[in-house]
Amino acid sequence: MSNRVIIFDTTLRDGEQALAASLSVKEKLQIAMALERLGVDVMEVGFPVSSPGDFESVQTIARTIKNSRVCALSRALEKDIDAAAQALSVADQFRIHTFISTSTIHVESKLKRSFDQVLEMAVGAVKYARRFTDDVEFSCEDAGRTPIDNLCRMVEAAILVGARTINIPDTVGYTVPSEFGTIIQTLFNRVPNIDQAVISVHCHDDLGLSVANSITAVQHGARQIECTINGIGERAGNCSLEEIAMILATRKGMLGLETGINAKEIHRTSNLVSQLCNMPVQANKAIVGANAFTHSSGIHQDGMLKAQNTYEIMTPESIGLNRNNLNMTSRSGRHVIKHRMEEMGYSEHDYNMDALYEEFLKLADKKGQVFDYDLEALAFMEAQAEEDNHYQLQQLVVQSDSTEGVATATVRIEVGGEIKTEAATGNGPVDAAYNAIARATDRRIDIISYKLGAKGVGQNALGQVDITAVYHEQNFHGVGLATDVVEASARALVHVMNLTCRADKVADYKQSMQKNRELGGV
């Protein structure tokens, strides 16, 4: 048996079913091209019979993708298979994936048929699909709850009439790993022609076991795993592609299995799917979460600085990230601060370590996480724990035109002790406020992240806006709190403006320090 596990991605079919709004054809094509770069073997890109839009997107992707096999879903109905075949016919290589329910509850309650009738429908569907391609996959929907005798009969019959891949889905995420492994093992033991097909699994995450069940399945002989980027999908989601890929890579010595995934594309692909699908990745998500390679504990940070593998079983570089993160918090030791200053290009002769660390702890206790620009200010601006308020928002007035969608904002800002009033228009109230603030401060920054949340509950809740902005190729993080979301957004921007102003002062000080060095060396 081959040790190669086929990765079947269904982000654009099962994954899209979880979205509040459908992706455009252009967005689906972007994701498909990212999946091709990632190296998925098969990508299931839609359900052509379901709508003209889905048909068009499947056809567009099938025409474009060359290095992955493109697949479309169909029920065990000739009209579905016809639509799939027509949409896929422009592809260099394609697969038709047809399915029917096999569990007792589905057969009796949903299909209102006998199992023998369902078996006949499945056989007919596979035969019909084989008219269009040799690559036919058949799925036993709700296999996890199907009586094993019936499941064996269905699998044997589908293989006999030409299915080259047999998918065993845990459709409702019901099974546990030992149970699911037994199902796969029983199929290998009892289905006489099982060597003529690849056994696939498609596990849902209702009980949080989709990845564990999929890994157990390949340990028992399955050689295709169906999954999605970031685990998106119906209800609690699907098996996560990035987790499967990195488990098989990280534990190759124990599992003896491999994939064709280009792991260095994982982070990039995860971000793209998250942005286009408007589904943020939770911070503690395995592999691709913001905290996956972040260390805050002083003990862990100390170990990481001595040897990276003390607390990391894989490197951030392996998934396409530049480096891990050592969060600078009140739990960080002196060695972490010294290490970070060295990474920014400073030697111990440039600053007073004792004074810096003392001020660092004060600031960390106050604000939680300390950033590079905070550290530089503490080191070179004489214990400046309090942030400069060169800019202070005095008043914000916004007017919106509901018919045109254009808003006008007027701001009054104190700039270095001088009051300035400016007005600007924008595409909505937040955009207008930002344009007015930029005009008043004459400071241009690029906002790359905007997050809206709440602090507190009920009537006492405040809107909290967190933004990340780029200024002179450095990221700055601003926070704004207010009862009004637009005002909170404006305060977050002014916060960033003050941080960039302080950064300019630090840069001037560093330049002066460098000149003094040069003069001293003459």
UniProtKB/Swiss-Prot annotation:
Coiled coil: none annotated. It catalyses: 3-methyl-2-oxobutanoate + acetyl-CoA + H2O = (2S)-2-isopropylmalate + CoA + H(+). Gene3D superfamilies: 1.10.238.260, 3.30.160.270, Aldolase class I (3.20.20.70). It is an enzyme of class 2 (transferase). CDD domains: DRE_TIM_IPMS (cd07940). It comes from the Bacteria. Residues 392-522 are annotated as: Regulatory domain. Pathway: Amino-acid biosynthesis; L-leucine biosynthesis; L-leucine from 3-methyl-2-oxobutanoate: step 1/4. It is found in: Cytoplasm. Residues 5-267 form the Pyruvate carboxyltransferase domain. Keywords: Amino-acid biosynthesis, Branched-chain amino acid biosynthesis, Cytoplasm, Leucine biosynthesis, Manganese, Metal-binding, Transferase. GO terms for cellular component: cytosol. Transmembrane segments: none annotated. Its main location: cytoplasm. Pfam families: HCS_D2, HMGL-like, LeuA_dimer. GO terms for molecular function: 2-isopropylmalate synthase activity; acetyl-CoA C-acetyltransferase activity; manganese ion binding. Signal peptide: none annotated. InterPro entries: 2-IPM_HCS-like, 2-isopropylmalate_synth_dimer, AIPM/Hcit_synth_CS, Aldolase_TIM, LeuA/HCS_post-cat, LeuA_allosteric_dom_sf, LeuA_bact_synth, PYR_CT. Its EC number is 2.3.3.13. Catalyzes the condensation of the acetyl group of acetyl-CoA with 3-methyl-2-oxobutanoate (2-ketoisovalerate) to form 3-carboxy-3-hydroxy-4-methylpentanoate (2-isopropylmalate). This is 2-isopropylmalate synthase. It comes from Shewanella baltica (strain OS223). The lineage of its organism: Bacteria, Pseudomonadati, Pseudomonadota, Gammaproteobacteria, Alteromonadales. The gene is leuA.
